[in-house]
């Protein structure tokens, strides 16, 4: 047999010892030296980096060399490096056979004798022969199981490669050169490769006589990592993993061992080939033929499932759960479509672990998977049905139906985080019902300290709800801060007054009192809807004297100002109360019949209010209502308000004669000196109310109409009086009588033009009910009858107008009443200042202030007085500024452009520009003061400043 021929021998001996047993202990290496002290580099030093394999092989070689020297002797220490590496601690028989290999390494024998080089001598080229090309054919390898326990795990990884590389052989190198190369690499031995102390005893070889008996325990030991079905295959797999290369001389001495191994090896070659073919399939699981076929079929069906996957757009519907979704989940019902989709997915889904299912179940699953594309084709049908369900749009409801539907709907208020809580829907509905009831329940109209002396206050108090209770002015105080009357007795509602009528009141109508709801509706009636429709039907008993005041000195306060002044309760509403008012002729007859009725003395003025209970903001408003500047000290404001209130009451008491001179009455009626604060407008309304409540007698000849005033004075009427009521000048005439003396002359001129423009229309309109109601016409007639002559009197031909023919009686719808709010001014009779036409539309004018007393009856008007006095003027200023044409010079923008650019506005310059004729262009006859312009700028949030600063110096920069 040639020297290079090799035979594969399967070894059933145990594995090599562990690496820790083979590697030597870490020896302390000398420290590195540099410079002239550095040791010279050996010629045999390797040029490449040292690897873990080189270190392991070199250390193992050192152990083998030491073992041979101690057991064999110097004559047998010339074995090759390959034999030393593959056959550790061989017997004397093996060492004798290997004698011919001495010439290969004889020249390298001396370097091994050196202690330092003998331990390091091993090259990095020994690892491939150990793993791939060398085969162990001698008996001692199989006889010593503990020697190879650490080697077999490494050889097992390269079992397949060892079979393919057998014919190539291996060219080994001498150990002398390997020792020189390993001298430098031994320094990098890791602590991990330190050998155990029990390694040297295991290197001793043992007898190899009973090699067949050794195979069996080795086979049992390897069954845990080999997957064969027969014991022979176990031998095959276990032995094939250990293939090594030995020389031909060793094979000739071990024929009987090789024969036994060859018989075993020949049987296992067939099994090994079969297993090698089945390796790709056994990588997943150990399966039989039938299971392999079923697995292939499952894979085929699984490929069809992605084709049917377009039916999974339901997964796209999964959206991230938001707080809104969580909040609305309690009100949403589960959709049936989602349930059906989930059930369909569960039925048709085939899990990946169903490889062991029977063929019947797999075929059924394949049928369901094959039927899935059909279901995908039918999937658009449900989408089509959903589209058909979506087009039905809600029917457009009428406003009434829409409001009813909204009132029945539950609204959830709050932020999304609040809505995410798990609240009971029933609790939410109950909460909404309670909120709805609280919003609908308006507060008691009598509970307000102000009876509504002006329509402005009435309209601002539309309904006391949850929002109105917290409404505030711009300066921070409540809109209805004076809801509770702390200085007077508690207010009395109409229902309570009907239940406990005062003894002097003989009105029997209150006995049949209506329910609280009807009285509530009557209370809520404002001046716009009341008019003269509260008159009883013709034929009712004559008007009874008014009831005396309540013990607190107050009359029953209604929302209507005329009822508040009259001082007696109003009868419940009846059907006749809502009929149109009587015609002009019938009204004159009622006025004539009312002129003979006596008047009761009016109650004494109420005591002054306690200003100490007012807040600072309210005190500031009261002071501003009297025309004073802001006072910082609270005590000073209270003292000032007390003096102002006393002066006004004295003026009201002293003006009784003037009021008597301005009103007309029957000859038998005497003036009432106890009337402290009667206003012509309010008194005329009171008289008109009393007259309308009187029965209307049969139509008689025309008589001179008379008007009963609140003062009850007697004044003769002119011979001729127009039957028609003026259209719009009645309110202006009242304001002309009661305007303060300090009124701006521009307003007087506007009122004069207003009277001139309206009087020709009065002459033409002589029949039927005029556009303006009759609440203020009696007062107008009275003021025109006995007012002192003025320039407007000369222009007004109403007193000399001949009486037209008797108008036909016809019913006209009730007109809205635009009352004149109260304001604090100086002298009510000094001069007249009728408001301009725009003031009627804006519900603002300059009414008299003589009757005003700082009580709860007039607090609302006083609070609004700082803003209501100049609202009309502000409207003119706004129109004048906004209607000015834009400038063409960018360097000189218009006033409106300056305001839009937030430029500071010089009040003196803007006032001069407005008075230069700009206000005349917008219909305002007069001039404005810089203070009014400043108020306008502040109301519009316009940046304004004075040209002269507080020190009296003129500003140079703006």
Swiss-Prot record:
Compositionally skewed regions (Basic residues) per UniProt: 109-121, 374-389
Post-translational events: Phosphorylated in response to DNA damage.
Keyword Nucleus annotated: yes
Residue ranges of the region described as Disordered: 89-123, 183-209, 326-400, 531-589, 594-613, 655-849
GO molecular function: 5'-flap endonuclease activity; DNA binding
Gene Ontology BP terms: DNA recombination; DNA repair; DNA replication
Compartmental location: Nucleus
GO CC, one annotated term: Slx1-Slx4 complex
Tree of life domain: Eukaryota
Bias (Polar residues) ranges: 342-351
SMART domains in the record: AT_hook (SM00384)
InterPro entries: AT_hook_DNA-bd_motif (IPR017956), Slx4_ascomycetes (IPR027784), Structure-sp_endonuc_su_Slx4 (IPR018574)
UniProt keywords, alphabetically: DNA damage, DNA recombination, DNA repair, Nucleus, Phosphoprotein
Composition bias type Pro residues, residue spans: 600-610
Basic and acidic residues bias spans: 332-341
One Pfam family this sequence matches: Slx4
Low complexity bias spans: 364-373, 655-666, 775-787, 821-838
Record text on subunit structure and interactions: Forms a heterodimer with SLX1.
Family: Belongs to the SLX4 family.
Free-text function comment from the UniProt entry: Regulatory subunit of the SLX1-SLX4 structure-specific endonuclease that resolves DNA secondary structures generated during DNA repair and recombination. Has endonuclease activity towards branched DNA substrates, introducing single-strand cuts in duplex DNA close to junctions with ss-DNA.
The protein's name: Structure-specific endonuclease subunit SLX4
Organism (species): Chaetomium globosum (strain ATCC 6205 / CBS 148.51 / DSM 1962 / NBRC 6347 / NRRL 1970)
Species lineage: Eukaryota, Fungi, Dikarya, Ascomycota, Pezizomycotina
Protein's gene: SLX4
């Amino acid at each position: 047999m040639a020297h290079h021929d090799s035979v594969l021998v399967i070894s059933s001996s145990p594995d090599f010892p562990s690496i820790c047993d083979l590697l030597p202990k870490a020896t302390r290496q000398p420290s590195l030296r540099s410079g002239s002290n550095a040791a010279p580099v050996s010629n045999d030093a390797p040029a490449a980096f040292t690897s873990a394999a080189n270190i392991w092989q070199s250390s193992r070689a050192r152990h083998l060399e030491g073992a041979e020297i101690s057991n064999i002797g110097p004559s047998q220490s010339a074995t090759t490096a390959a034999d030393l590496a593959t056959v550790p601690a061989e017997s004397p028989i093996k060492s004798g056979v290997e004698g011919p290999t001495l010439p290969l390494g004889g020249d390298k024998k001396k370097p091994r004798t050196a202690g330092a080089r003998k331990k390091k001598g091993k090259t990095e080229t020994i690892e491939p022969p150990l793993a791939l090309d060398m085969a162990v054919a001698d008996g001692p390898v199989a006889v010593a199981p503990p020697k190879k326990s650490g080697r077999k795990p490494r050889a097992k990884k390269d079992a397949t490669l060892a079979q393919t590389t057998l014919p190539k052989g291996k060219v080994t190198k001498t150990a002398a050169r390997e020792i020189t190369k390993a001298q430098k690499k031994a320094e990098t031995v890791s602590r991990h490769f330190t050998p155990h102390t029990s390694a040297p005893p295991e290197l001793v070889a043992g007898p190899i006589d009973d090699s067949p008996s050794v195979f069996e325990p080795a086979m049992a030991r390897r069954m845990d990592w080999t997957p064969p079905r027969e014991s022979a295959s176990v031998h095959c797999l276990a032995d094939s993993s250990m293939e090594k290369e030995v020389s031909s001389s060793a094979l000739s001495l071990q024929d009987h061992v090789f024969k036994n191994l060859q018989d075993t090896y020949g049987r296992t070659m067939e099994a090994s080939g079969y297993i090698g073919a089945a390796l790709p399939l056994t990588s997943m699981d150990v399966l039989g033929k039938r299971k392999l076929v079923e697995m292939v079929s499952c894979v085929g069906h699984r490929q069809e499932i992605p084709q049917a996957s377009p039916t999974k757009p339901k997964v796209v519907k999964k959206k991230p759960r938001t707080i809104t979704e969580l909040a609305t989940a309690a009100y949403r019902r589960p959709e049936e479509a989602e349930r059906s989709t989930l059930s369909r997915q569960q039925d048709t889904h085939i899990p990946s672990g169903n490889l062991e299912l029977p063929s019947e179940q797999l075929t059924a699953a394949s049928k369901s998977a094959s039927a899935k594309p059909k279901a995908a084709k039918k999937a658009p049908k449900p989408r089509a049905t959903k589209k058909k369900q979506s087009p039905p749009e809600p029917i457009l409801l009428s406003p009434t139906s829409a409001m009813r539907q909204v009132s029945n709907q539950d609204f959830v208020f709050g932020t999304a985080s609040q809505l995410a809580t798990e609240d009971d829907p029933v609790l939410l509905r109950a909460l909404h019902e309670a909120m709805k009831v609280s919003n609908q329940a308006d507060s008691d109209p009598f509970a307000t300290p102000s009876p509504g002396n002006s329509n402005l206050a009435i309209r601002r108090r539309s309904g006391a709800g949850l929002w109105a209770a917290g409404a505030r002015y711009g300066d921070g105080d409540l809109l209805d801060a004076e809801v509770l009357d702390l200085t007077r007795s508690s207010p009395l509602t109409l229902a309570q007054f009907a239940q406990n009528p005062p003894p002097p009141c003989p009105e029997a109508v209150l006995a049949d009192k209506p329910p609280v709801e009807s009285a509530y509706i009557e209370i809520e009636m404002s001046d716009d809807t009341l008019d003269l429709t509260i008159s009883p039907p013709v034929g009712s008993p004559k008007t009874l004297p008014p009831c005396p005041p309540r013990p607190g000195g107050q009359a029953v306060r209604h929302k209507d100002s005329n009822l508040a002044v009259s001082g007696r309760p109003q009868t419940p509403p009846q059907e006749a109360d809502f009929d149109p008012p009587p015609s002009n002729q019938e009204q004159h007859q009622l006025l004539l019949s009312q002129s003979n009725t006596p008047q009761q003395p009016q109650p004494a003025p109420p005591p002054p209010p306690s200003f100490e209970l007012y807040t600072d903001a309210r005190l500031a408003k009261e002071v501003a209502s009297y025309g004073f500047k802001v006072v910082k000290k609270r005590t000073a404001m209270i003292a000032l308000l007390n003096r102002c209130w006393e002066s006004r009451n004295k003026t009201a008491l002293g003006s009784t004669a003037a009021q008597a001179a301005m009103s007309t009455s029957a000859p038998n009626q005497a003036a009432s000196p106890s009337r402290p604060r009667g206003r012509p407008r309010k008194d005329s309304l009171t008289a008109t109310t009393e007259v309308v409540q009187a029965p209307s007698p049969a139509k008689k000849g025309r008589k001179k109409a008379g008007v009963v005033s609140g003062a009850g004075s007697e004044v003769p009427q002119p011979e001729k009086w127009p039957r028609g009521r003026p259209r719009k000048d009645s309110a202006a005439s009242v304001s002309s009588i009661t305007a303060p003396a300090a009124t701006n002359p521009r307003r007087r001129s506007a009122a004069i033009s207003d009277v001139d423009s309206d009087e020709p229309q009065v002459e033409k309109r002589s029949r039927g009910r005029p556009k303006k109601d009759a609440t203020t016409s009696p007062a107008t007639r009275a003021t025109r009858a006995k007012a002192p002559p003025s320039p407007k009197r000369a222009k007004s031909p109403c007193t000399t107008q001949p009486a037209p023919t008797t108008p036909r009686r016809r019913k006209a719808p009730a007109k809205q009443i635009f009352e004149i709010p109260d304001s604090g001014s100086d002298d009510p009779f000094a001069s007249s200042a009728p408001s301009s036409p725009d003031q009627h539309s804006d519900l603002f004018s300059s009414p008299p202030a003589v009757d005003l007393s700082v009580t709860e009856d007039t607090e609302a008007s006083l609070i609004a007085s700082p803003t209501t006095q100049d609202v009309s003027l502000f409207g003119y200023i706004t129109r004048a500024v906004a209607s000015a044409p834009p400038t063409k010079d960018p360097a000189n923008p218009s006033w409106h452009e300056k305001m839009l650019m937030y430029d500071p506005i010089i009040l003196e310059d803007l006032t001069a520009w407005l008075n230069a004729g700009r206000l005349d262009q917008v219909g305002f006859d007069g001039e404005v003061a810089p203070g009014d312009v400043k108020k306008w700028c502040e109301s519009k949030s316009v940046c304004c400043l004075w040209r002269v600063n507080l020190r009296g110096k003129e500003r140079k920069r703006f």
